[in-house]
Structure formats: C-alpha cells, structure tokens
C-alpha cells in the first residue's frame, strides 16, 4: 500500500512515525532587533492563523484581518488547510487499507447514524458561525469606514489649520517687509498701516487651502515640514582627530501613541494621527457646562429679619448663604471676624444687601409683640366676676371683714394678727354673685403691695375704723385707688364699739376728696362690723351694683393673660405663683411667661386647695411649673411654643441686669462725687442676707431697710431670696461677714449644721416690726457717737518755772470751777486758742492731786507742749459721748 496520502482522502490512519494531533504546528521565525550602542536581540516571531468556517470568498476577505503578527521571512510555507466536507452515509464504504498495510473494518449501522448526526450538527453549527461571522464582518466594515471618515475629517481639519497658520505668517511677513521697504524709501505709510493686518481670506478661496477629502493638498503647503523634521532628527558628532559622524535618529514605533497617553483598539489598528477626545475631557466639559448653567441661574432674594445684634452664623443661616462667604465679604471690607462673633444690625444690613437680600429690622422688644393686650372678639365676650381689693390702715379690720365674708378665719393664721402678704380668694355672695377678693397689707412697709393690688382690681373697698378715723395708710390707699382709676366703696368698720364715730370718718374723708353719698357725693358707703357680721349682705349688694355699672366682660376663648399677685418658693413643690387670670382661660399644660421666668403649667390650685384643669377670667389660682420665682406684679401670658418663651424670658432677664447696672452707675455718681466721697470718711455698711417665705414680704423688707440708710451707715443687702436657708446662704453670710435673717422660713438641716460649725447666728422673725427694729438698733451701733463738752473750770498762769527732766511747769490759780487731772484743756492767749491737749501733771505743794478747786493755787504741765506764758488762761473741760440712733 502506498504511503502517499491523496488530497481527497479523509480516512483516519495511524502512522508509526508521526504523532496524531488536533491542530497544526505553529509557524515560527527569528527576527533580530537592533538597539542603540550596537546592541541587538533575537526575537522569535510566531504567526498564528485562526481557522474560520465559511465560504471561500469570505475567508479570503477576512484572512488579512486575522493576522496578529506579520509572517517572518524565514518561516516555511504552511500546508494547505483541509476543509471538512459534509458527507452522507448513504451506503457502506468498502474496507480500505491504511498506509501501514492494516485493513480497517467497516462501520456499523449505529456508527454511521451517529456519524451522520454529528455531521448534521456540525453543518448547523457551521451555518450559525457563518452568519455570525458575516454580521461581525459587516459591523467591522462599518466601524472601519466610520473611523476612516473620522480620520479623514481630522486630517482635513489639521491641514486647514496648518494652511491658515501659514497664510497668517505669510501675510504678517509681507506686511512687515512692506513697512520696512516704505520706511527705507521714505514713502509715507498708507492709512491703516499701523493697524492690525487684515484677516486672512476664507479658507475656501485661499491658494493654500486644503484640498477636498481624498485629494492630496498642494506641495508648497506641507512640503517644507518633513524637511524640517528630518533636519531636527539629525545629530552631528564632532570629535578631535576623528572624522565627523552624522547620526540619524530612528523613529520608534508606537512612540507617538505612547506620548499621547492610553492606546485604544481603534488607535492601535488604525493609522490616525490626531488624538480623539478622552472620557475625562468629556466629563470636564460637561461639568463646566453645568457650572455655567448654575452661575447663570437667577439668585433667590430673601427677606432677612435682623435683630439689634446677631451672630455671623445666624445671619448666614437666615440668608441661606455660607458663613464663609459672609466672612469673605467682611474681610474685603477690612473686618476680620469669626462665625461666632456678634455684629450690630447696621453691619448685618450692609452684608445682607450686598448679597442681594432685603432686610427687615426689628428691635429686641419686638419679641413681646402680640403677647399682651390683643383685641377680643365681641361675640366671645361674657360677664366676669368683679375683682375687689380690700385696703386700709393696719389693724382696721380688713382681714377680719374678709373672713366674715368668706366664713373663714385668716387672722388667726397671720403672725401678730397683721397681714404680711397678699391673699386672693373667690367667694359666692348671698345673692349668688361670685366675687374675687384681694387682701392687701396695711403696714407702711407694704406700699408696693397696695399699689400692685390697686392696679389689678376693679373695685376698692376702703376699710376705715370708726373709732380710729383716717390714718396715713388710709390716705395712701386712697391715692393708689385714684391713681389706678378704680371706684371706691367706703366700709366704716367697728361700728359696734362704744367709741365709734362714723360721722367723724365721713368728715375726715372730705380732706382727701372722697365725698360719700350721705354727704351728697358719688362714693358708696356702708357701716359694717366684721366681728358682729353687721351689714355684710349690704356690702355685697353694693359690690354687685358697682360691678353692674362697670359692665365687666372678658373672653374665655383666647390665650390667658394675668398678673402675679404673690410668689414663693415651696420646698416640695418648687416655685409657686399666685396668679389672677384677667383674660382668657389658663389650662394645665400651657406654656407661660411671667417676668424673666417661664415654664409649663403643671398644676392649678384654687384658694380652697382644689386642683383644677383650667381657670377662667377673674379667678385667682396658684400656678406650679415656673422655672423660678417670678416677681409680684409681673404680667403672665401664654405663648405658643417653648422657643418664644425662652426668647422672651432671656430678653427680660437681660433688661433686668442692664437696669441693675444702670442703678449702680447712678449710685456711683460723677467724678466730683467720687472725689468728695474719698475726702470724707467712708460710709459704714451693715451687710445682710435675707430669706423670706413670699416675694411680697421680701420686697417689703428690702424697701423698709433701704429707707434706714444715711450718709454714715447703710444696710447692704448682699442677697435676698425666697425659700429656706441653705448651705450656700450660710457660706455667703460667713464669707461676707453678714447677718443671716430668716423671715417666716427655717434653715435646712445642712445649713443649720454648717452655721453651728461656723459659729454663725441665724436670726428668725415672723413679724416685720421686730425685724426692722433689730436691724435699726444694729445700724445705730455703727454710728459715730455725738461728742458734748462739759466745762469744768478756768485757771490763770501766774508764773512759769523750768524744771530739769520735767520741762516747763505753769504756776496757776483756779479762778472758777475746778481743774481735774487727765481732763482736756485749752490754752488761750489773747482770747485765741493756741493749744488743745490734756494735763499731764497737777500738783499742789509738791503733791499729786486729782483736782483743785477755785481760789487755790497749783502747778500744771501739758502733754507734749511747753510754750506757756504768764497771763495765759487754761480752760479745763470734759468730753462726753452720747450714743446716736437712726
């Protein structure tokens, strides 16, 4: 059997000399690569061809694109690739003999069917791969055509740019040469010669313009550039004693692409020379366009509310600007600032207007705007109970009269039987009318309380004792009522006493312009007896009549407003304020502001001790929930949120501190006053630390003690507060050397123990008279006593003796009175006092004596004085100290 294999023979054979392989060997060749300095390197180059399934013409067209590396010249020509031809096993093939002489057996029917199925499947796969190859070839052709168009367009743009540049250079050169020629020939320059050269003509009409796509451009336009590049690529080396050597730099393959950056598939396979736009450049351009759009966007202008002072951070927040921009603007104006710095309203307005915003200026007091005195809706107004204040002199029976009306006993609970704080109660009269009563103290120390009671009242009941008449506090109560503009009802009390004289009371009231009805006036009057309960119903009827004339109305359907009647610090409940609701309805849970304190209503307690959920107009209640004890007389209002409550309280607290500082400045006075105070003796101070049960009593104590101040001594109140005596109070009193006083309060256990350890006495009082008297006596002890001279006698100097170790001694005769040893003396010469001092020696016949009476002679010597002459008169007297009182 022949060893030669026929081209059309596709039978499998086993060769003893060759190995059976599934792919043909790779064709390889060796290429020597040269480097600088004579170095070279042998590189093995392999050529790999991918087997493609398809028609012969498709394979021929796509074959050049499948080459990855060009074939080396040393490579042997490859053997022809055999294409598998599909065969149909229709008939059994005869047995054939292989090249080795081995006879192969014929295929069975199952094997032929399996081979047929395999061939049909291979044929289907070939068809699918052929279609896929056609699609890929078509897409590749389109991509290559598009890339060729892009490269052609890029080359055209490049040629146009080069042509335009050359034309501009040529035009510039011609204009310069023309100008030089004219200057050299002395010809005048034409008009416009110094102007800029004319614009180059259009590219379409330029002689060196780029040719249409696909046609070569003129040689003159781009012919010079390769020559220049060739000259630049040459390097001449001259060495002494050796011939000149010219080295031409070889172009490095792929150097241009490496210098341009990252290579893409299109740039690696194509021949384009211009680099296309990268993704990063596209992103940067998009961001620039976005930024341009945002800059051209119209800026929003806002209305900025500016208080009197504001921080830079808050100003930036209100303008919706960055704080950095505000600081930059201030730095441009020459001001260095931080975001926490506070600026005034004028500076803030300039900044806001510079940034394009409008400004609305507000004052600090605007935080209280709308808190009080807002108008009521007429349809919501209903009748309210009258608020009646009982006023009069101390011990005229005000509280007893109120007890008789309330059927209670308040007097027994008051220390000393006098009212020392305001009490507010609501009763229902016999005629069914609810009446709110406010009981005020009658003592002189409680002037502020009476004025406060008159301001919140509708009717004043002036109580005058029939047996005592009009007293100073009665006249003061009349003044308060007239100042408040409220009507007065005169209640002549104690008519059951035998020495009662109601007519005298009526006559005395005329001195204060109070004319009762019985004397033809318009002031209502009634004679009552609190102890015997006489005419109490008549008093209630008069109050109801006066209230009906006043037509008292209020709206309960609105935020509550009221006034603090009294305030105290309770040990278990905290700050407690007695509030008289004047308008609206106060409810549990409301946010309220009173003076410089704010809080949330935790509980409402009426005068009977009953917890209530709400309190309407003219109802007095105890309010729990304040952050601190408000001051009596402060107005209370309900606000909508906690932020505004804090803002109002902070503003009032700031105002309070500023007023206190202003009072301190006024007390210091001018520079002349300060100098005069320095010249005189310093005023002695009596330091005090006072704690009281309620705000009203504390206010009265402080006001009374301030009235005791004189030019020589003053009561210095270091601290005055409401509540029990604590450790801090004891520490403060010990450090300042003050007297610690408790009025109707006691010291806590810790404070009492600390006071015992420090040896500090705590003085407790429950009657204001005793407190004021003790403080007055202590302050009187600080006063310098009054000096009074008591004349003893006179003596005349008859002779002056000089005695060694003693000095001068005057021999005298006592003319009147007596002279005592150690007494004060004056030396009078020609009716002029020349010396004041004391006697150091008094002798009679060489004996020391205590005194010498008139008509006797004696010897006298002065302390630290020797200038005595015959005829001088010695006046002897004694100084007596008399204690002063305030």
Swiss-Prot record:
One of its GO terms (cellular component) is cytosol. Residues 493-496 are annotated as: G4. CDD domains: IF2_eIF5B (cd01887), IF2_mtIF2_II (cd03702), mtIF2_IVc (cd03692). It is found in: Cytoplasm. Residues 383-553 form the tr-type G domain. Keywords: Cytoplasm, GTP-binding, Initiation factor, Nucleotide-binding, Protein biosynthesis. PANTHER family: TR-TYPE G DOMAIN-CONTAINING PROTEIN, TRANSLATION INITIATION FACTOR IF-2-RELATED. One of the essential components for the initiation of protein synthesis. Protects formylmethionyl-tRNA from spontaneous hydrolysis and promotes its binding to the 30S ribosomal subunits. Also involved in the hydrolysis of GTP during the formation of the 70S ribosomal complex. This is Translation initiation factor IF-2. The gene is infB.
């Amino acid at each position: 059997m022949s060893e030669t294999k026929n081209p059309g023979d596709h039978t499998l054979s086993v060769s003893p000399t060759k190995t059976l392989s599934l792919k043909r060997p790779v064709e390889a060749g060796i290429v020597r690569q040269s480097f600088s300095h004579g170095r070279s390197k042998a590189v093995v180059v392999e050529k790999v061809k991918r087997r493609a399934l398809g028609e012969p013409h498709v394979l021929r067209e796509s074959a050049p694109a499948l080459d990855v590396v060009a074939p080396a010249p040393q490579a042997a020509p490859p053997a022809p690739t055999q294409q598998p031809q599909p065969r149909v096993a229709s008939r059994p093939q005869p047995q054939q003999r292989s090249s080795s002489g081995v006879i192969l057996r014929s295929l069975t029917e199952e094997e032929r069917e399996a081979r047929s199925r395999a061939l049909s499947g291979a044929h289907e796969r070939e068809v699918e791969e052929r279609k896929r190859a056609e699609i890929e070839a078509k897409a590749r052709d389109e991509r290559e055509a598009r890339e060729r168009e892009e490269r052609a367009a890029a080359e055209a743009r490049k040629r146009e740019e080069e042509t335009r540049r050359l034309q501009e250079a040529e035009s510039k050169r011609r204009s310069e040469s023309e100008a030089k020629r004219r200057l050299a020939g002395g010809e005048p320059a034409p008009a416009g010669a110094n102007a800029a050269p004319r614009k180059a003509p259009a590219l379409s009409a330029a002689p060196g313009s780029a040719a249409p796509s696909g046609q070569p451009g003129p040689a003159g336009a781009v012919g010079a550039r390769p020559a220049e590049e060739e000259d630049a690529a040459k390097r001449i080396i001259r060495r002494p004693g050796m011939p000149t050597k010219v080295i031409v730099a070889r172009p490095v393959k792929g150097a241009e692409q490496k210098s341009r950056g990252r290579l893409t598939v299109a740039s690696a396979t194509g021949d384009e020379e211009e680099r296309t736009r990268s993704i990063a450049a596209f992103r940067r351009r998009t961001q620039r366009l976005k930024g341009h759009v945002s800059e051209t966007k119209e800026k929003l202008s806002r209305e900025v509310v500016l208080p009197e002072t504001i921080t830079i951070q808050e100003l930036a927040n209100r303008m919706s600007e960055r704080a950095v921009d505000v600081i930059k603007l201030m730095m441009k104006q020459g001001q260095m600032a931080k975001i926490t710095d506070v600026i005034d309203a004028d500076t803030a307005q300039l900044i806001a207007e510079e940034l394009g915003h409008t400004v609305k200026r507000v004052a600090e007091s605007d935080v209280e705007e709308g808190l009080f005195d807002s108008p009521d809706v007429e349809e919501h107004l209903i009748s309210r109970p009258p608020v009646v204040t009982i006023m009069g002199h101390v011990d005229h029976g005000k509280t007893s009269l109120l007890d008789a009306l309330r059927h209670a006993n308040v007097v027994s609970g008051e220390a000393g039987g006098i009212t020392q704080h305001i009490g507010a109660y609501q009763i229902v009269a016999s005629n069914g009318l609810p009446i709110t009563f406010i009981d005020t103290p009658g003592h002189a120390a409680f002037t502020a309380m009476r004025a406060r009671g008159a301001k919140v009242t509708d009717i004043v009941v002036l109580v005058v004792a029939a047996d005592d008449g009009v007293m100073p506090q009665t006249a003061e109560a009349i003044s308060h009522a007239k100042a408040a503009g409220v009507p007065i009802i005169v209640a002549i009390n104690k008519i059951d006493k035998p020495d009662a004289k109601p007519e005298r009371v009526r006559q005395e009231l005329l001195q204060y312009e109070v004319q009762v009805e019985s004397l033809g006036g318009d002031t209502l009057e009634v004679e009552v007896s609190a102890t015997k309960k006489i005419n109490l119903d008549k008093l209630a009827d008069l109050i109801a009549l006066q209230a009906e004339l006043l037509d008292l109305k209020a709206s309960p359907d609105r935020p509550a407003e009221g006034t603090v009647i009294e305030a105290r610090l309770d040990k278990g409940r905290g700050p407690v304020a007695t509030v008289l609701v004047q308008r609206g309805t106060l409810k549990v849970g409301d946010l309220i502001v009173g003076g410089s304190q704010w809080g949330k209503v935790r509980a409402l307690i009426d005068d009977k001790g009953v917890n209530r959920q709400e309190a309407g107009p003219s109802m007095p209640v105890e309010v729990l929930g304040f952050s601190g004890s408000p001051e009596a007389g402060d107005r209370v209002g309900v606000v909508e949120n906690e932020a505004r409550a804090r803002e109002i309280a902070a503003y009032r607290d700031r105002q309070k501190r500023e007023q206190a500082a202003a009072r301190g400045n006024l007390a210091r006075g001018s520079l002349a006053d300060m100098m005069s105070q320095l010249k005189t003796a310093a005023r002695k101070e009596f330091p005090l630390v006072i704690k009281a049960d309620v705000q009203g009593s504390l206010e009265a104590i402080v006001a009374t003690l301030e009235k005791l101040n004189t030019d020589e001594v003053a009561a210095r109140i270091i601290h005055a507060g409401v509540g029990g005596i604590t450790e801090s109070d004891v520490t403060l009193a010990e450090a300042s050397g003050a007297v610690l006083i408790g009025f109707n309060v006691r010291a806590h256990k810790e404070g009492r123990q600390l006071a015992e350890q420090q040896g500090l006495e705590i003085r407790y009082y429950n009657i204001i008279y005793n407190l004021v008297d003790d403080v007055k006596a202590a302050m009187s002890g600080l006063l310098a006593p009054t000096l009074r001279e008591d004349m003893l006698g006179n003596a005349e100097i008859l002779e002056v003796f000089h005695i060694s170790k003693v000095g001068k001694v005057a021999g005298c005769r006592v003319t009147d009175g007596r002279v005592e040893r150690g007494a004060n003396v004056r030396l009078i010469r020609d009716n002029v006092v020349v010396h004041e001092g004391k006697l150091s020696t008094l002798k009679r016949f060489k004996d020391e004596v205590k005194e010498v009476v008139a008509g006797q002679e004696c010897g006298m010597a002065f302390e630290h004085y020797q200038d005595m002459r015959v005829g001088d008169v010695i006046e002897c007297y004694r100084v007596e100290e008399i204690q002063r009182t305030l």
